[in-house]
Amino acid sequence: MEGRHDNSPTQAFDKDVLELTVEDVYDISYVIGRDLLKVNTGGNREISDLQFKIVRVLEMFETMVNKYNLSLEELRMEMDNMRTETDRVVAEGSSGNINTVGPNKLVVDLKDPNRPRFTMQELKEVLQERNKLKAQLLVAQEELQLYKSGVLSSQQNMVEVNLETVPQSEPLRSSITEESKEKSTIQKLFSFRPK
């Protein structure tokens, strides 16, 4: 504050616009007000109107300088935060806490709820398996509809076919074992799958 008393209010006019503070705006308004009082000794109406316009401009100027200083302070705080974060990352890197990552590698934050959980290959395999299961479900549903409509007999035995061997002309009923008679309904429905 002592340096402030040593400086005259007119020095605020010599500063760069971006260096002005709110106190400088007050100094400028003081100088302009003092000069207007010297001129307005005669009570001239035009000078009085000009005085109100100047006060309004100074108020706008004060608001603008205040906003600029707040923005500047926010930027300084952000810069300090970034500098602190950079120092922390550098310190972690030098202490060996960070694994080195080569090209074509992705660093994933395990706490991020939107992180990728599967590789593309795993997703392709899951989708292919899903499509196969969908196809099997559709076949099973069609077969179930045939059973319900009576087209297929519910007592009709299903035969498993091995696609790698040459099929016999007609399977013998005596070759059906007791084990195949006890198959569950789901096993019967999916018995068309190749071995």
UniProtKB/Swiss-Prot annotation:
It holds the Pfam family RILP. One of its GO terms (molecular function) is protein dimerization activity. Its main location: cytoplasm. Keywords: Cell projection, Cilium, Coiled coil, Cytoplasm, Cytoskeleton, Protein transport, Transport. InterPro entries: DZIP_RILPL, RH1, RH2, RILP_dimer. GO terms for cellular component: centrosome; ciliary basal body; cilium; cytoplasm; cytosol; membrane. The keyword Metal-binding does not apply. GO terms for biological process: cilium assembly; epithelial cell morphogenesis; protein transport from ciliary membrane to plasma membrane. It comes from the Eukaryota. Residues 115-185 form the RH2 domain. It is found in: Cytoplasm, Cytosol; Cytoplasm, Cytoskeleton, Microtubule organizing center, Centrosome; Cell projection, Cilium. Residues 8-92 form the RH1 domain. Residues 58-149 form a coiled coil. Involved in cell shape and neuronal morphogenesis, positively regulating the establishment and maintenance of dendritic spines. Plays a role in cellular protein transport. Belongs to the RILPL family. This is RILP-like protein 2. It comes from Danio rerio (Zebrafish). The gene is rilpl2.
